[in-house]
A protein has these predicted regions:
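Glycine-centered, phosphate/nucleic-acid-interacting loop/turn motifs that mediate DNA/RNA or nucleotide
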Residues: 57
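Short beta-strand "wing" residues that participate in macromolecule-binding interfaces
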Residues: 61
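Short, cationic-aromatic polyanion-contact patches
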Residues: 7, 64-83
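Short, hydrophobic-biased segments on the C-terminal half of alpha helices
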Residues: 47-51
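Short alpha-helical segments that sit at the start of domains
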Residues: 1-14, 18, 75
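Amphipathic alpha-helical dimerization/coiled-coil segments
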Residues: 82-123
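Short acidic, hydrophobic short linear motifs in intrinsically disordered regions
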Residues: 21-35
Length: 127
């Protein structure tokens, strides 16, 4: 699984938040404005990060006049799932790693896992 650097993650968080809010794909200017309060980044830096993320396969882009519009290829949850599966692949014993993971989560998270497993066994999508 490809990882994200700190700045790449920050940019992805802006795009994932826009996606969560139902907002269309973003230009580099949109991302620069969203980051203006938190980070003092040059617009060219944001453009470079967006281009790099597109080349790595994290973003899709389409022309909009002279600008590019970017959108995440995968949801935040999908990305985290890939990271978790990648980490699981690195273990020598997946079963033990899964048991250890389940022991380390909260009781509310255990309930979520139970519901997801029940939905899988009954072929119903989880709520």
């Amino acid at each position: 699984v490809k990882g994200l650097g700190e700045l790449e993650r920050t940019v992805m968080e802006v795009l994932w938040a826009r996606e969560d809010a139902g907002t269309a794909a973003a230009t580099a200017r949109d991302v620069s404005r969203a980051l203006a309060g938190d980070r003092d980044l040059a617009h060219t830096t944001v453009m470079t990060v967006l281009d790099r993320l597109a080349k790595k396969g994290f973003l899709a882009r389409e022309r909009d006049g002279r600008a590019w519009r970017y959108r995440p290829v995968e949801s935040r949850e999908g990305y985290v799932t890939e990271l978790m599966l990648g980490a699981l692949e690195e273990t020598g014993d997946r079963d033990k790693a899964l048991v250890h993971f389940v022991k380390s989560v909260s009781s509310d998270e255990v309930d979520v896992l139970r519901q997801a497993l029940a939905a899988l066994t009954s072929k119903e999508p989880p709520a």
